């Protein structure tokens, strides 16, 4: 739902105030719409973690909230993103791994981030030893 607020000053009568207010609100609702970003599936592909206790980390997006755009311009919105193919451990939750931008007629309307959804610790000696022992026991 889109909310619009109109402030009218200096109206000559209550009838004029309501008439002008209705025109202003009709104009706003008739001229604009809410655009909710459609994030491509490729953005959510996991990223490989080098030297981590986990092989990969899931990703999420931040700052990709809906925005108001001129009505009918939805098909002209373009999405561009860049993200790391792999990253070295440690990785903290919320760590920036890329950017995602939405543009309308060349003007940036949304500038978001691609971030790690989980933390991945750097592999240590104890973890590596435990992993080796577990693999030996599974033979």
Feature locations, PLM:
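Domain-terminus/edge residues, biased toward the C-terminal soluble/receptor-binding domains
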Residues: 1-139
């Amino acid at each position: 739902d889109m909310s619009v607020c109109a402030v009218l000053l200096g109206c000559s009568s209550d009838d004029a105030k309501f008439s002008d207010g209705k025109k202003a609100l009709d104009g706003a609702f008739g001229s604009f719409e809410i655009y909710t970003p459609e994030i491509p599936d490729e953005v959510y592909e996991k990223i490989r973690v080098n030297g981590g206790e986990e092989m990969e980390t899931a990703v999420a997006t931040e700052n990709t909230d809906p925005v108001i755009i001129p009505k009918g311009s939805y098909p002209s919105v373009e999405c561009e993103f860049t993200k790391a193919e792999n990253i070295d451990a440690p990785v903290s939750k919320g760590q920036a791994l890329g950017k995602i931008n939405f543009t309308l007629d060349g003007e940036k309307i949304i500038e978001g981030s691609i971030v790690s959804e989980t933390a991945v610790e750097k592999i240590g000696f104890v973890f590596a030893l435990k992993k080796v022992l577990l693999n030996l026991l599974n033979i």
